[in-house]
Amino acid sequence: MIGRLRGIILEKQPPQVLIEANGVGYEVHMPMTCFYELPELNQEAIIFTHFVVREDAQLLFGFNDKQERALFRELIKVNGVGPKLALAILSGMSATQFVSAVEREEIGALIKLPGVGKKTAERLVVEMKDRFKGLSGDLFNSVSDIPLTSPANVDNRVGEPEAEAAAALVALGYKPQEASRMISKIARPDADCETLIRDALRAAL
């Protein structure tokens, strides 16, 4: 199993990053909240990974630290939550914000995430609350004061930012028309792709 990668960032195509380690390029799917924190292209990055094997694909999911990965692993144990939905959840909210929403039973905030209906939101609250008790680290301590719309720092520039941002939202589970609408509502001339994604996801909460 591949648990950690240390290598050079070759490409960024949200929510995927291509990282070269020992001459091999790995395509890694990352929550956007983790993606924002990546170094610039051609810089070294360390990513903690979770390897998923399916009948039709082998996928790597990446995170900035072990606690975020631990949360992802607990999420995909919840009935009805697969890796793609877990990725979307942790893109719409940071790991800390998600823990806070579950602890405060913020059903209204959870159902705004792509692919999360009321039943799934209720299931997340019931099942994840118990799972947090078995996890260690600052992420899973009391976080009741964490706002659900805290911004992330973004400074990477890409071409055709609006189209790429909409494509990234579709990859996270939004319908194409909905993704385009979300981007058009917050688009501005000086915004890069990652800024547009961040602002669109933040506005959806």
From Swiss-Prot:
Residues 157-205 are annotated as: Domain III. One of its GO terms (biological process) is DNA recombination. Residues 65-143 are annotated as: Domain II. InterPro entries: DNA_helicase_Holl-junc_RuvA_I, Hlx-hairpin-Hlx_DNA-bd_motif, NA-bd_OB-fold, RuvA, RuvA_2-like, RuvA_C, RuvA_C_sf. Keywords: Cytoplasm, DNA damage, DNA recombination, DNA repair, DNA-binding. The keyword Cytoplasm applies. GO terms for cellular component: cytoplasm; Holliday junction helicase complex; Holliday junction resolvase complex. CDD domains: UBA_RuvA_C. SMART domains: HhH1. Residues 144-156 are annotated as: Flexible linker. Residues 1-64 are annotated as: Domain I. GO terms for molecular function: ATP binding; four-way junction DNA binding; four-way junction helicase activity. It is found in: Cytoplasm. Has three domains with a flexible linker between the domains II and III and assumes an 'L' shape. Domain III is highly mobile and contacts RuvB. The RuvA-RuvB-RuvC complex processes Holliday junction (HJ) DNA during genetic recombination and DNA repair, while the RuvA-RuvB complex plays an important role in the rescue of blocked DNA replication forks via replication fork reversal (RFR). RuvA specifically binds to HJ cruciform DNA, conferring on it an open structure. The RuvB hexamer acts as an ATP-dependent pump, pulling dsDNA into and through the RuvAB complex. HJ branch migration allows RuvC to scan DNA until it finds its consensus sequence, where it cleaves and resolves the cruciform DNA. Belongs to the RuvA family. Homotetramer. Forms an RuvA(8)-RuvB(12)-Holliday junction (HJ) complex. HJ DNA is sandwiched between 2 RuvA tetramers; dsDNA enters through RuvA and exits via RuvB. An RuvB hexamer assembles on each DNA strand where it exits the tetramer. Each RuvB hexamer is contacted by two RuvA subunits (via domain III) on 2 adjacent RuvB subunits; this complex drives branch migration. In the full resolvosome a probable DNA-RuvA(4)-RuvB(12)-RuvC(2) complex forms which resolves the HJ. This is Holliday junction branch migration complex subunit RuvA. It comes from Pectobacterium atrosepticum (strain SCRI 1043 / ATCC BAA-672).
